[in-house]
Amino acid sequence: MRLMRRLLLFVAAALVFSGCVGSRVVERGEYVDEVVIHEVVSARYEIASSLPVDYADDMEWILRYDSSDVEELRQRAATEDKECDVLFFGSSSIRLWRTLEEDMAPLKVVNRGYGGAMLRDIHYYYETVLADYRPRAFVFYCDNDLGGFGRDLHPTELFDLYRLLVERLKADYPEYPIYFLAIKFNDSRLAKREEHRLFNAIMADYAAHTEGVSFVDVNSPLLNEDGSVNNAYFESDMLHVNREGYAVWSSILRPMLLEELGLDAK
């Protein structure tokens, strides 16, 4: 059994907790069950989450963007206004949304995406990504855990991480909705197509049965009638959507958010 299937989530209501969750240092190559990566304590819940890894040096991989993209997020958080309507976060498909503010107007949005992010990283950097922002809704996109890399997860393993993210957000922002964007099919990762399809189906079903969680199909409008990818919506890398692709996403997502937050479209 792969270790990621042993993802741990402990939720206890109205507990007062002090102290640290510890992890032992292991030598290179030593097999371990999990390394505790984060602890969140809120007024309503205590959540201690563990990220299973194969070896201790996996932490070097988790921290691979700490001095670059993640550091940029830290610096921006020090100066940006924390009040916003919607916080967008996730991987490069969020970060590269250069026209996000324009596309979502009159919604006040903040972009907390960073390139190469996996959901495993985002769990580690949860407090860094969200910082002290005070949004009224969340939008999340991340597909790199199913990106065709050596560290890929199975769709059901990734689903466990999504459920963990929901629990953490609901603990800290109990009244605010969460919108998960479907993984977009793309020709750059054609070999992962069926895994993307399976994961989207899992998340759509989960959202349909989970209060405060929405699954937004931003994938289907980017496809041709025969189900192939319409590359007119993609950059030359065949991975990231271009301006036209983001316009499609905006046309779907913006009305949902405006209605959710009770704002006029004008």
Regions found by a protein language model. Give the residues of each.
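N-terminal secretory targeting modules
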Residues: M1-F10, V16-V86, E102, E260-K266
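Oxyanion-hole/transition-state-stabilizing segment in secreted/luminal serine hydrolases
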Residues: I94-V110, D121-F159, Y179, I183-D187
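Generic structural signal for well-ordered alpha-helices
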Residues: Y126, Y162-E167, N200, A204
